[in-house]
């Protein structure tokens, strides 16, 4: 599925990140997409999957200012999170420029990268679970996972 590319940005060939975000948000026919903005990413929830794009920003604590840095950040996210949620994290997918517009996973030049995930039931998010009764075991399990993650974390 493609949509015409517009705007220019040297960091993504000749396609701006704004054009990519517009394409992912609604540039594909017959696909309902919900957009969630965070301070460093934009997540697009489709019926069966989620695509997460890193914002083209440089902050004191992270640098996603180039296409290559965003690709590496997506790959790092997959590496870290696939250990704990292998059934959710699918991989990194390119957003490409094709003759007739933008495509997800196309063969043309890459203009952006996204983390591809399986969309899970929103009733299973921690904020929704926290509005009910949380069992102490959940906290213990979460603490163990976090401790293990810190033990194996790469320090740069």
Regions found by a protein language model. Give the residues of each.
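Conserved ATP-binding subdomain of kinase catalytic cores across diverse folds
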Residues: 15-156
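Serine/proline-rich low-complexity intrinsically disordered segments, especially terminal tails, linkers
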Residues: 8-9, 43
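Short, surface-exposed ligand-recognition loops at beta-strand->loop->(often short) alpha-helix junctions
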Residues: 12
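N-terminal acidic, proline/glycine-rich, low-complexity intrinsically disordered segments
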Residues: 1-7
């Amino acid at each position: 599925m493609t949509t015409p590319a517009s705007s220019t940005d040297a960091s993504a060939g000749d396609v701006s990140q704004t054009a990519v975000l517009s394409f992912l948000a609604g540039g594909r026919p017959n696909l309902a997409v919900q957009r969630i903005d965070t301070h460093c990413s934009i997540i697009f929830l489709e019926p069966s999957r989620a695509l997460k794009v890193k914002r083209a920003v440089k902050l004191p604590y992270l640098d996603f200012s180039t296409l290559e840095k965003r690709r590496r950040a997506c790959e790092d996210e997959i590496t870290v999170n696939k250990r704990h949620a292998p059934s959710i994290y699918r991989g990194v997918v390119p957003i490409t420029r094709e003759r007739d517009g933008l495509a997800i996973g196309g063969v043309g030049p890459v203009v952006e990268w996204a983390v591809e995930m399986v969309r899970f039931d929103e009733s299973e998010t921690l904020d929704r679970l926290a509005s009910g009764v949380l069992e102490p075991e959940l906290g213990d399990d979460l603490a163990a996972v976090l401790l293990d993650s810190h033990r194996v974390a790469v320090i740069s």
